[in-house]
């Protein structure tokens, strides 16, 4: 009975309740981040992120309390209260490196999962140090970033896949290259890419890719190029 009462007294000690609440917060926030990875069937899920967050949280608490304890024992002892936390950040990198894969086609995968591991450690440290608001806001922002990134990527991809207009132009000689490109630039055509190929007959073939233009501008561009001295033929692919 005495042991049980001592245990209950220790559990309901205000200081111990604060420690428990910090570790519980770290576990919850780590699990929330890990759940996103779990739903995507990634190797790092709820359990891993929760373990990382709780462990870094308790190490941070120990680091801070140890610094305070030994400072009271002797005035000659001074330690950095966040020393253990700093070592955790360094060591967690090795765990993150284990999930990064370099495939045969030079593609690299696992970077987001590695970042999640590092983020879980950071949130655990924040919770352990008592920065509750920071830990919660960081978790929310991480989840929002993960959810929004596919939408942003699709939007950027659509923008990058805008239609292009390709001109395949055959000119008499190299001097006509500058005339043709300058003609397009002067008429507000945005050139994206130019490729020059010498022909066996001494002529030069230009392949010019411009950002997509409407049908009216396309007709004008075709007419301008056909009328230019030195231009033998013009092909347009829109």
UniProtKB/Swiss-Prot annotation:
Keyword Transmembrane helix annotated: yes
Domain of life: Bacteria
Bilayer topology term: Multi-pass membrane protein
Any one Gene Ontology cellular component term annotated for this protein: plasma membrane
Transmembrane segments: 16-36, 44-64, 81-101, 123-143
Cell membrane keyword on record: yes
Keywords from the UniProt entry: Cell inner membrane, Cell membrane, Membrane, Transmembrane, Transmembrane helix
Pfam families: MgtC (PF02308)
Compartments where found: Cell inner membrane
Family statement drawn from the similarity comment of this UniProt entry: Belongs to the MgtC/SapB family.
Protein name as catalogued: Uncharacterized protein HI_0647
Species name: Haemophilus influenzae (strain ATCC 51907 / DSM 11121 / KW20 / Rd)
């Amino acid at each position: 009975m005495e042991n049980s009462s001592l245990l209950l007294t220790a559990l309901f000690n205000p200081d111990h309740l604060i420690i428990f609440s910090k570790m519980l917060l770290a576990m919850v926030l780590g699990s929330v981040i890990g759940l996103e990875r779990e739903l995507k069937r990634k190797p790092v899920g709820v359990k891993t992120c929760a373990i990382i967050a709780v462990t870094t949280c308790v190490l941070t608490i120990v680091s801070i309390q140890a610094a305070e304890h030994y400072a009271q024992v002797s005035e000659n002892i001074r330690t950095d209260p966040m020393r253990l936390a700093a070592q955790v950040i360094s060591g967690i990198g090795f765990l993150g490196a284990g999930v990064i894969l370099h495939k045969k086609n030079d593609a690299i995968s696992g970077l987001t999962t590695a970042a999640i591991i590092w983020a879980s450690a950071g949130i655990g440290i924040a919770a352990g140090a008592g920065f509750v608001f920071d830990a919660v806001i960081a978790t929310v922002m991480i989840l929002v970033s993960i959810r929004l990134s596919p939408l942003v990527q699709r939007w950027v991809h659509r923008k990058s896949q805008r239609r292009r207009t390709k001109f395949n132009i055959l000119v008499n000689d190299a001097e006509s290259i500058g005339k043709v490109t300058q003609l397009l630039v002067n008429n507000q055509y945005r050139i994206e890419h130019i490729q020059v190929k010498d022909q066996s007959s001494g002529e030069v073939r230009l392949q010019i890719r411009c950002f997509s233009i409407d049908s009216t501008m396309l007709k004008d561009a075709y007419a301008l190029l056909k009328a230019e001295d030195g231009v033998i033929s013009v092909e347009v692919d829109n």
